[in-house]
Amino acid sequence: MASRFPKFSQGLAQDPTTRRIWFGIATAHDFESHDDITEERLYQQIFASHFGQLAIIFLWTSGNLFHVAWQGNFETWVNDPLHIRPIAHAIWDPHFGQPAIEAFTRGGAPGPVNIAYSGVYQWWYTIGLRTNEDLYIGALFLMFCSALFLIAGRLHLQPKRKPSVSWFKNAESRLNHHLSGLFGVSSLAWTGHLVHVALPESRGIHVRWTNFLNVLPYPQGLGPLFGGQWILYSQNPDSSSHLFGTSEGAGTAILTLLGGFHPQTQSLWLTDIAHHHLAIALVFLIAGHMYRTNFGIGHSIKDILEAHTPPGGFLGRGHKSLYNTINNSLHFQLGLALASLGVVTSLVAQHMYSLPAYAFIAQDFTTQAALYTHHQYIAGFIMTGAFAHGAIFFIRDYNPEQNKDNVLARMLEHKEAIISHLSWASLFLGFHTLGLYVHNDVMLAFGTPEKQILIEPIFAQWIQSAHGKSFYGFDVLLASTKDPAFVAGKSLWLPGWLKAVNDNKNSLFLTIGPGDFLVHHAIALGLHTTTLILVKGALDARGSKLMPDKKDFGYSFPCDGPGRGGTCDISAWDAFYLAVFWMLNTVGWVTFYWHWKHITLWQGNAAQFNESSTYLMGWLRDYLWLNSSQLINGYNPFGMNTLSVWAWMFLFGHLVWATGFMFLISWRGYWQELIETLVWAHERTPLANLVRWKDKPVALSIVQARLVGLVHFSVGYIFTYAAFLIASTSGKFG
């Protein structure tokens, strides 16, 4: 008899119902739960899957380059980045009528195309690519890398090439290689590319493989490096009249500390970026030689952690036993990695718009909005995942004996204090912020807007002033010409930085007022509530006063039967599930704030945000309703336009979102009864009853239906906002 899906679980494979399929899919990547799994095979499978993941990423990026080279307008765009719309790829759709063909034929293309809002054109332009041939070469190289990683993944599954568990658990060696190799060497290589290829290209000098060895990136070559005159590399930078991509106004410096932005491109100086990467490379190359491996020199992480005992003995045994706990738990390691990656992704969102690194990207408003929103949503999902795996660690990998009285045990012991403090912070923020918003709404509704409670964010304004913003009149630190910090930095990076901070055309240190104060606290409410749900889920994952034996039921369980009331919805998975709703809510507020603030800034109408953002009706009417007008009337009997597809996606997003509630509100019994009725009808319908199934159809489990509901809710929510964001921004600014 042929083996049935899933091969990794004989118990599931023999299940006579459709549960076999859904549970099979749900546990396909839960390698720990598979039949015949060993620790060694677990590590090897994950290792091999990493190569597959990298292969997919390289294939995807190769596809981006290939399609732009084939169907885009990169070479035309390069000649006029501010006025030509970058094309992502062509569209072929049999449903398009003449109005659609005309609407989507733009950017100088012969037929319908999609416009790129990803910023890749600006990135490729900044790093020195100029022709379609450059793009094709890049695509082929990445395709080669993709194939290489697939072969490497397969190779490491061969018996002779499988690494041992001890190799995987050699934390010091892995850290050294990742710090030095992954971050250090790659940053150094990137500095090399910027200095040898991107910088000359920005100054009108074309460097490729043919002349790579003949063109000196700096007139004196490596002389200043070996002569100890490093400052020479920063002398004669590009002037403020430099035209990017030409020799007009260009300098010869390669590593600078100018601060601020290139006046024409409105992006960071390329020489500053090269300098930054060189510094990063140096730091990580040193960091990658810190840990003790075969040579008996350097730090032992275990020794550091064991020695890290708090003074006075008040806080227990500190970090004792942490090394083994972390090193033997993949979920702990994944939780730490996801937490770090989540924070970094959110930082990318914040820095890409405030300190744009790519030439002309700051003037492409739709791209700026799309990139900010994209990275904040990604960050939200990654951060919630960190807590999910933290909870799984507590259930599957945590050993109370091994961690007696250390920092982990003490976190669990005083979890009530942690959770109740978070709860208090959430309630405080929620009631006060909502109270202020609602008060202001009532005042406007009753015709007395002067009675609004408007609080100036003076502490935040003071911090902005300390960084050099003079608008508020605080004579402090860099905002004061007499301050020692101001005097010390005057000859270095300060002139460029101060010019940028006080320029109203960019997004660096935006001017803030009462509307910002309120929405800041609304976002703080969202962050604290999301954190409360996630932290509670992880700290209560092993057990609570209500259910002391919770860990025995695993990560996701619906309830412990009817005889034990109140055990529904309290699994660690349920906490994750609830937190995702709050995370989406929070990211929604963050992106609403960012987008509204910026479209009023870009339109030269900052007063609209300042006046309307202090009460809820202002947000609903002057941000959401006003900017969705083109989407609500997106296509009609009289024709269509370039926004029609976004109007349709706006509608479709709402539909997907609403479908989620069907799974979230009605439970298993309803669906089981419905399925049985449909099966009865199917078996009695001519022709239809020729089709049979081997598995008896049964309803999804409670946990699975929640997941399906959550996925629909999330996808619909994001689709709806993505369509709104792109249409409302591109409709205004093109």
Swiss-Prot record:
Q: Name one Pfam family in it.
A: PsaA_PsaB
**Which PROSITE patterns does the entry link to?**
PHOTOSYSTEM_I_PSAAB (PS00419)
The residues that the entry says bind chlorophyll a B1 are: H654
- So where does chlorophyll a B3 get bound? M662, Y670
Catalysed transformations (reactions): reduced [plastocyanin] + hnu + oxidized [2Fe-2S]-[ferredoxin] = oxidized [plastocyanin] + reduced [2Fe-2S]-[ferredoxin]
Record localization: Plastid, Chloroplast thylakoid membrane
Q: Just give the chief location class.
A: plastid
Q: Provide this UniProt record's keywords sorted from A to Z.
A: 4Fe-4S, Chlorophyll, Chloroplast, Chromophore, Electron transport, Iron, Iron-sulfur, Magnesium, Membrane, Metal-binding, Oxidoreductase, Photosynthesis, Photosystem I, Plastid, Thylakoid, Transmembrane, Transmembrane helix, Transport
EC number in record: 1.97.1.12
Q: Membrane-spanning regions, if any?
A: 46-69, 135-158, 175-199, 273-291, 330-353, 369-395, 417-439, 517-535, 575-596, 643-665, 707-727
One Gene Ontology cellular component term attached to this UniProt record is:
chloroplast thylakoid membrane
Q: What are the protein's GO molecular function terms? A: 4 iron, 4 sulfur cluster binding; chlorophyll binding; electron transfer activity; magnesium ion binding; oxidoreductase activity
The UniProt note on the cofactor reads as follows: P700 is a chlorophyll a/chlorophyll a' dimer, A0 is one or more chlorophyll a, A1 is one or both phylloquinones and FX is a shared 4Fe-4S iron-sulfur center.
Group of enzyme by EC: oxidoreductase
Q: Which domain of life is it from?
A: Eukaryota
Tell me which residues bind [4Fe-4S] cluster: C559, C568
Q: Which residues bind phylloquinone?
A: W671
Task: Give the record's membrane topology.
Answer: Multi-pass membrane protein
Q: Which protein family is named in the record?
A: Belongs to the PsaA/PsaB family.
Q: What does this protein do?
A: PsaA and PsaB bind P700, the primary electron donor of photosystem I (PSI), as well as the electron acceptors A0, A1 and FX. PSI is a plastocyanin-ferredoxin oxidoreductase, converting photonic excitation into a charge separation, which transfers an electron from the donor P700 chlorophyll pair to the spectroscopically characterized acceptors A0, A1, FX, FA and FB in turn. Oxidized P700 is reduced on the lumenal side of the thylakoid membrane by plastocyanin.
Q: What is this protein called?
A: Photosystem I P700 chlorophyll a apoprotein A2
